[in-house]
Amino acid sequence: MILRLSLFVSACFMIPIQASAEQYFVKNQLEYFAAEKKVEAGDVITLANGVWNDFEITFSGAGTKEQPITLTAEDPGKVILSGQSNLRIGGKYMVVSGLVFKDGFSPTGEIVSFRRSSTDLASHSRVTNVVIDRFSKPDRFEADLWVGMYGKHNRFDHNHVAGKSNKGVTFAVRLTTPESQQNFHRIDHNYFGPRQTLGSNGGETLRIGTSHFADTNSNTTVENNYFDRTDGEVEIISSKSGKNILRGNVFFESSGTLTLRHGDGNLVEKNVFIGNGKDHTGGIRVINRDQIVRDNYMEGLRGDGFASALTIMNGVPNSPANRYVEVENATIENNSVVDSARITFGAGADAERSVACLLYTSPSPRDS
């Protein structure tokens, strides 16, 4: 089978600049922070090529849809943020592109944060063509996030994120305040590269929400991403909120599943799972109400139980939202499972998870 993947074409986009817009070319941190204090809609800050060591970037302002404020590299890929470095974005209509994080780690709990502070969240902002390469804490048991997404209407696209070796979710959509809920974020066309097995919870590659916000809608779209051997834990993507769209993603030899852990009304469609016979590779795990799972392709998966090619969980009677809500009113249709070890219905059945789902099948077109 040949998969034609067009995920990593560089995003070429034009940013219109008014005659009054300022171009700041900066060669050190003092010059950067002086420019960052002055930027207005349409302005561009360009970092000079080279290694920027121990650089904690804050980037906030008031751009517009037509005139975003941009932080970029002199040449994409040639601005290296090393040592103890990170990036915090606030304001609105801000764009960051072309930076590389490697040979270091964040001194805080996040490398890239879509908030400058608890009161300055990013909105309508974008991080694109950025690399985070093995930028892990030295102590593998010290947790952090590599990307924390807050605010609303933000986009993370065409980035390379690989090699996390310490505890903590690689990418988390945070719903901690109303200002970050029903956010309509987009996470698309990214490469999520190998992550070693953590051996405990907290090793997801992507988590949308947490159990504290299980009844909250996130309205986040995750599409056209490539998950390459992301083996952190059994949940590669953990959707813990409602009304999310997970579409057109590829999971290549990744141990674990796309899991609808909490939240109702999610859509999972047109994803491809290729296991190539690797142990513990799985597909989709379904929990909660009103989920739609359609037109997905699963081949060569060897996981079973919670990591089967398709897993339908048993529920807890009258379950609170943060436990195991029974699968109800789910639509699971037009999915293909090829050369895979297991499809599991009633997974996790025990004295607590005692509610099985009722299955209804539609007639095959050949039977009509």
Question: Each PLM stretch: what is its role?
Answer:
Residues 2-8:
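Sec-dependent signal peptide recognition
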Residues 30, 72-75, 85, 105:
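Residues at the C-termini of beta-strands that transition into short coil/loop
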Residues 19-34, 49-51, 74-75:
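Right-handed parallel beta-helix/beta-solenoid
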Residues 8-9, 19:
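Cleavable N-terminal signal peptides
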Residues 56-57, 83-90, 102-125, 132-362, ...:
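Glycine- and acidic/polar-rich repeat regions and solenoidal domains
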Residues 39-80, 87-98, 120-125:
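Beta-solenoid repeat scaffold
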